[in-house]
Structures are given as structure tokens and as C-alpha cells.
Amino acid sequence: VIQTKPWLAEVPWDLVIFQNASLCKQKNALHKPTSDGYETTKAFWESSQQQPMKLTEAVDLCRRCHRMAPFCFYNGNTFAAIARSMVSQLDLSEADAAILRSLVGHIVAGVATPEQQEAFRRFCEKD
């Protein structure tokens, strides 16, 4: 079973901003906070990111932040990249890590099938 720990402790809000700014720059898109979602998402992230949680909960936190839309563009890509980076904290073969990165990216983006979501849950709970 994958341990409960502060998966996002090394990702302060400034790093979330940097991730989004980098993605926007690569795509020549406007990097700007939204008036509706930015402050709420920032407060949620800052109150949650140091907390110990299951990997499934950390991925769900990223999914929820994507849905809250703190930035004008690339919210999904921003939080999916952060979620995929958590996979590097696991001792996995390169093939398993690639599969898991793909799964968490799809979950955060909201495009994972029920089967993919179940596969991720089972992976996180296996001995």
C-alpha cells in the first residue's frame, strides 16, 4: 500500500504559478489569474498542500484545483503536471511510472474512464 504522506509539501503556491506561467509561455497564451477562481484555489491549496494524505487524495486535490480554474489558461495541464511529478516519489519501474503518470494526468484533467480511475485506486491499495 502506498503510504500516506504530504505529497504536495514541496509544491508551494508560487511553484503552481510558475508551472502555469511556463506552460502559457510555451503556448504563447496569456498567463493571468482569474477573478473567480484564483483566490479560492490559492487558499485551498495553501491550506491543504502540507497535509499528509493518500496519493489518491493528492491527485484528487489537483483535480479539484483544476476545476476551480485559478488561471485563464492551462489549468488542467498545470495541475496534471504537478500530479505526474508525484509519481517520481515512488520506487517504480520506468514502465510502471509511465503508466501511472498517464493515469494521474487523465484523472486530474477529468478525462479518465471509470476503468482507469479504478486501476489507479487498485494500484494505490495493492501490497
Residue ranges, per PLM feature:
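FIC/Doc superfamily catalytic core
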Residues: 1-127
